[in-house]
From Swiss-Prot:
Signal peptide start-end: none
Annotated compartments: Cell membrane
Organism in which the protein naturally occurs: Mycobacterium leprae (strain TN)
Function: F(1)F(0) ATP synthase produces ATP from ADP in the presence of a proton or sodium gradient. F-type ATPases consist of two structural domains, F(1) containing the extramembraneous catalytic core and F(0) containing the membrane proton channel, linked together by a central stalk and a peripheral stalk. During catalysis, ATP synthesis in the catalytic domain of F(1) is coupled via a rotary mechanism of the central stalk subunits to proton translocation.
InterPro entries registered for this protein in UniProt: ATP_synth_B-like_membr_sf, ATP_synth_b/b'su_bac/chlpt, ATPase_OSCP/dsu
Gene that produces this protein: atpFH
Protein name: ATP synthase subunit b-delta
Length: 446
């Protein structure tokens, strides 16, 4: 019994301990577990709800995506069609432009090739024609016939007048022109009372005074001041040169400074002109004017073919006396004797170049010599020497055309091939075969 009671007490104690120390934690654990399960069930329910919502959203999104995709595809198809149409239109326009451009280029190339062909054909035709002409005029008779044909054409020209005057007048203005004419008349009156030696002296003294005035610009400017009272100018020239020149020269100088001149240099030109007239007067008295004129002109042609000599005569770094000595040495070495009057005229011209090229100054001198006789000078170029009959006929024809006696100055240029080229003053009559060939070539298309 006691054992039973003991066991009962022990069991009661164990129950007590279990109730107080085991049951509460277990209960709490069970409650916690229950709450956890309940919460998990709630969360599972919520997750299921969310899954349903997600499924619904996915389904809706899928349907929306399909609709959007269909819309995008439809728009893309429409855009593609529009782009294709635009590209096709642009391609058509570009193709048409390329066709037009190609057609223009083909036409341009065709025109260019045609022009080149014409040009080559034209040049070849001119070359062949030139060759035929050269072969034709190689015969002296045929070449002479070209001159005759030109003279026939020239003879048919309408006559027209040409006034003959001192070439220097063409370079001067009205006041100087009147002054030069008056001075030339004064010289003509004085020259009647002078012998040839006095005219030589007059020419030399006038050249010396002209050289002095060319150096002394201030003096020249004072002597050409356009005032009514010429007494101070006459007094000045008397004081400067009366002790060094003769009375005829002083008379010319007084008359010169009494005139009104348009430019300072015209006075020097006038004195040079009168000095030339003095020498040409001597040549006329001695019946040598034709020889003097021909030799002066021939020397101008020499300067054409000897440019080195022209350069030496133009070299102003060399004193004028040295250039005159060079001129005299050249003339002395000539195969024929040079007329002393021609030598004097050429020497004066070289001394008084005053910036003018020697070739132009000497050619101008030849024109002065011709003009003194009231003749027109015609510079004629030919491919070969013309016959005396042709020269006579040319002189007669030109004299009828210009209404004055004409002096023909010939020069030979084989490059002219045939015909003649005539220069009278500023007028050129070109009837050469070479000019016809050049004109034919110039008329070819570019």
């Amino acid at each position: 019994m006691s054992t039973f009671i003991g066991q009962l007490v022990g069991f009661a104690a164990i129950v007590y301990l279990v109730w107080w120390y085991v049951v509460p934690p277990v209960c709490r654990l069970m409650r916690a577990r229950r709450d956890a399960v309940r919460q998990q069930l709630t969360e599972a329910a919520e997750a299921a709800d969310r899954l349903v919502e997600a499924s619904q959203a996915h389904t809706k999104a899928t349907e929306d995506a399909k609709v959007e995709a269909q819309r995008v595809v439809k728009e893309a198809v429409e855009d593609a069609k529009r782009i294709v149409e635009q590209l096709q239109a642009q391609a058509d326009v570009e193709a048409e432009r390329i066709k037009l451009q190609g057609a223009r280029q083909v036409e341009l190339l065709r025109a260019q090739l045609t022009r080149q062909l014409r040009l080559k054909f034209g040049h070849e035709s001119v070359r062949q024609a030139a060759e035929l002409v050269r072969n034709h005029v190689a015969d002296a008779v045929q070449q002479s016939a070209t001159v005759d044909r030109f003279l026939d054409d020239l003879d048919a020209m309408t006559p027209k007048g040409a006034d003959v005057e001192y070439p220097l007048l063409a370079k001067m203005r009205s006041a100087s022109r009147r002054a030069l004419v008056d001075l030339a008349d004064r010289f003509g009156a004085i020259a009647k009372s002078l012998d040839n030696q006095a005219l030589y002296t007059l020419a030399g003294e006038l050249v010396s005074v002209a050289k002095m005035l060319d150096r002394e610009i201030v003096v020249t400017r004072y002597l050409t001041v356009p005032v009514e009272d010429e007494a101070p100018r006459v007094k000045l020239i008397d004081r400067l040169v009366s002790a060094h020149v003769g009375d005829p020269t002083m008379e010319i100088l007084r008359a010169a400074v009494s005139e009104r001149w348009s430019a300072n240099t015209d006075l020097v030109d006038a004195l040079e002109h009168i000095s030339r007239q003095a020498l040409l007067e001597v040549a006329e008295r001695e019946d040598q004017i034709d020889e003097v004129e021909d030799q002066v002109f021939r020397f101008s042609r020499i300067l054409d073919v000897a440019p080195r000599l022209a350069i030496l005569l133009d070299d102003y770094a060399v004193p004028a006396d040295s250039r005159v000595r060079l001129l005299c040495n050249v003339l002395q070495s000539a195969s024929s004797v040079v007329n002393p009057i021609a030598v004097a005229l050429l020497s004066q011209t070289v001394e008084l170049l005053r910036g003018q090229p020697a070739k132009e100054a000497i050619l101008f001198l030849a024109e002065v010599a011709v003009a003194r006789r009231g003749e027109v000078v015609a510079q004629v170029s030919a491919a070969a020497e013309i016959s005396d009959a042709q020269r006579t006929r040319l002189t007669e024809v030109l004299s009828r055309i210009y209404g004055h006696p004409v002096t023909v100055q010939m020069q030979i240029d084989a490059a002219l091939l045939g015909g003649l080229s005539i220069v009278v003053g500023d007028e050129v009559i070109d009837g050469t075969l070479s000019s016809c060939l050049v004109a034919a070539e110039a008329a070819l298309p570019d």
